[in-house]
A protein has these predicted regions:
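Residues in intrinsically disordered, low-complexity segments of regulatory proteins
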Residues: 8-11, 50
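Bacterial N-terminal signal peptides
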Residues: 12-25
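Secreted/extracellular ectodomain signature
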Residues: 27-148
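N-terminal secretory signal peptides that target proteins for export/translocation
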Residues: 1-7
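N-terminal targeting/trafficking signals and adjacent low-complexity tails
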Residues: 8, 15-16, 30
Length: 148
């Protein structure tokens, strides 16, 4: 009888860690799927090709990962501010990106220097005091930084 109890106890002692180890990958994958990817783009060039490249990259990431699986912000400042003006050649693409859930913000410091007001800008964009500071904060928050 003692021998049987010892065998049962020994079998349990060996089986328990194996069962627990089998659960670890399930827990890890559940945590991974809850993690949201975060991406911040810098647009500070005056060339529409660069604007379109940033917008293409944002769309491609959403298409690949799923729009709900990634947070994307495009920070526009300096000579790139033309991307967000009412008469921008990229205006329709900016509107499409906003509808797709991409956050697009204009630097108010740049707007002040260029004597632009919010009425000069595309509707539905956001604003930040300083574009460079916004990029820094986003990187500190774990956003991957891209400059097309």
């Amino acid at each position: 009888m003692t021998r049987m109890i010892f065998r049962n106890w020994l079998a349990w002692l060996i089986a328990a860690p194996v069962c627990l180890c089998a659960l670890v990958p399930l827990t890890a994958s559940a945590q991974t799927s809850a993690v949201k990817n975060k991406l911040v783009f810098q647009v500070s060039d005056a060339e529409p090709q660069k604007w379109n490249l940033a917008l293409n990259n944002a769309k491609n990431v959403q298409d690949d990962l799923g729009a709900g699986a990634v947070q994307i912000e495009i920070v526009v400042y300096g000579p790139g501010i033309g991307m967000l003006k009412q008469d921008s050649v990229a205006g329709n693409r900016v509107a499409d990106a906003l509808k797709a859930g991409v956050t697009i913000v204009a630097c108010e410091n740049t707007m002040t220097v260029q004597k632009l007001v919010k009425d000069d800008m595309l509707p539905a964009i956001g604003y930040v005091k300083a574009g460079v500071v916004e990029l820094m904060k986003k990187q500190q928050e774990g956003y991957a930084y891209i400059r097309p």
